Amino acid sequence: MKNEIKDIYIKASVATICTALFKKGLKNQFIQGISPLNKKISKMLGLAFTVRYIPAREDLNLIDVFKDPNHPQRVAVEECPKDYVMVFDSRKNPRAASAGSILVTRMMVRGCGGVVTDGGFRDSHEIKNLNIPTYHNRPSSPTNLTLHQAIDINVPIGCGDVAVWPNDLIVGDQEGVVVVPNNVIKEISKEVKFMTIYEDYVLKKVNKGSSIKGLYPLTNEDEKNKFEAWLSKQS
């Protein structure tokens, strides 16, 4: 992904990106039920690397499974590429942790761009102080083995009622996380860029006392001309 496109998304709000996706017909791209652990560093951008959990079966998910160097969760932590965002499919179930501070720290040190789960993290009081964006539903102390069985990595998953394919673009801010399908990243970026500029313009006008009628949305011809004149000066 080109730096120019990255800059567009990193400067845009998740709300703006959601609207740009809706204009394309994609209305279910905002991951439901999650929020950032540390809102001071919640801006997040990266391609998706995924882990899929299924309900744990007691005879197959004993504590000893972590001794296997090929355990999917452990492999994922070591293979998630630099700048990618790890996304866990925990079936919206926070009764057991998707990961804890040691694994999240490892991903931070390896240079991952963030960690997202529709479940919960254990050691959340430690994770919120790490220098990596993290999003979850709520804290959860029990180990993942009690409820979640890691079954596959880097496959299509569901996270918070949103389909996430490997290499989809994951963008997060203080409100939450949106998923931009890989095949429309460039196309959506054009609308996101325009909307960000336009919304900044509108906010400045409204702060100075302007009415939103004819301005937001831009339906008044006089307001259109004013915006176009302002836009030409910016470029």
Predicted regions and their residues:
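Feature captures the catalytic cores and cofactor-binding loops of soluble hydro-lyases/lyases
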Residues: 1-166, 180-213, 217-235
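Beta-strand-loop-alpha-helix segment that lines the small-molecule cofactor/substrate pocket
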Residues: 173
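Channel- or pocket-lining gating/hinge segments that regulate access to a cavity or pore
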Residues: 176-178
